[in-house]
């Protein structure tokens, strides 16, 4: 059944969040701060390992880099477009709207937790690749694995950052179902190279999310999102 993978992913995020809420109320503030740093380290390593998979190759027994030009152009042009549109502002507005609608207007951490968790779970290689596989073949195994990882990570995030991270299931559902639908409709454009490049830059953005978890406010990750689409488009130009 096409789209089932995202439904499972959403369910696991909600389950992990509820566990985080249950345990979080018994944690001291120092432990919550430490868990937030741990979340950042985990996300950093996930992003780094994903990017290295596409950046480094072994040729004739030696380690070489691949695709640096595509990565540089995608990140620079994507950042310029993102800053002009100011996606960070609009995602913050959406986060504030969700906060108000869910009765959490008094929670100062809600929007930051919502944005951070949403970006962590939507721009990664597993989400993109898994949604495309779901759309093309109905295979949801990658999204099932992603859901398990998301559930563990969101449990830590909710424990340390609050319930805003729980509602990340909304953009996760919207984004992954859209990718699944697009993959089902535009299958010829979903070439292996396009998917690899999209996943490559997406992993770099995951790394940036980890930086923001450890050093909040240093990177406006949402304004870098156009880089993902630039990477896919450049596949057919470079």
Please place each PLM-identified region on the residue numbering.
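A generic, lipid-embedded transmembrane alpha helix
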Residues: 39-55
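Alpha-helical transmembrane segments in multi-pass membrane proteins
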Residues: 8-16, 20, 24, 40-41, ...
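Intrinsically disordered, low-complexity non-transmembrane regions of multi-pass membrane transporters
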Residues: 1, 29-30, 87-113
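Cytoplasmic-side transmembrane-helix entry/capping segments in multi-pass membrane proteins
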Residues: 31-41, 96, 165-175, 222-228
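Helix-loop-helix junctions within the multi-pass membrane cores of secondary transporters/permeases
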Residues: 99, 108-185
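Interfacial loop-to-transmembrane junctions
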Residues: 210-229
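Structural signature of hydrophobic alpha-helical transmembrane segments
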Residues: 2-15, 66-73, 131, 135-147, ...
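Membrane-interface helix termini and inter-helical loops of multi-pass transporters
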Residues: 53-65, 129-134, 183-192
């Amino acid at each position: 059944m096409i789209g089932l993978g995202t439904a499972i992913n959403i369910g696991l995020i909600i389950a992990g969040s509820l566990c985080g809420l249950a345990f979080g109320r018994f944690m001291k503030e120092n432990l919550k701060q430490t868990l937030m740093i741990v979340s950042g380290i985990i996300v950093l390593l996930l992003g780094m390992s994903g990017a290295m998979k596409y950046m480094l190759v072994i040729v004739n027994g030696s380690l070489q880099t691949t695709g640096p030009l595509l990565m540089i152009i995608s990140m620079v042009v994507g950042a310029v477009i993102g800053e002009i549109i100011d996606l960070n502002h609009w995602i913050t507005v959406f986060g504030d709207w969700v906060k108000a609608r869910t009765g959490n207007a008094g929670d100062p951490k809600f929007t930051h937790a919502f944005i951070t968790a949403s970006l962590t779970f939507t721009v990664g290689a597993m989400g993109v690749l898994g949604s495309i596989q779901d759309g093309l073949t109905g295979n949801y195994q990658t999204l099932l694995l992603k859901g398990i990882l998301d559930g563990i990570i969101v449990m830590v995030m909710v424990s340390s950052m609050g319930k805003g991270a729980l509602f990340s299931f909304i953009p996760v559902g919207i984004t992954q179902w859209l990718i699944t639908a697009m993959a089902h409709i535009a299958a010829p454009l979903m070439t292996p190279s396009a998917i690899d490049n999209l996943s490559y830059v997406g992993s770099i953005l995951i790394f940036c999310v980890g930086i923001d978890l450890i050093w909040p406010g240093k990177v406006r990750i949402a304004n870098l999102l156009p880089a993902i689409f630039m990477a896919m488009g450049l596949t057919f130009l470079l």
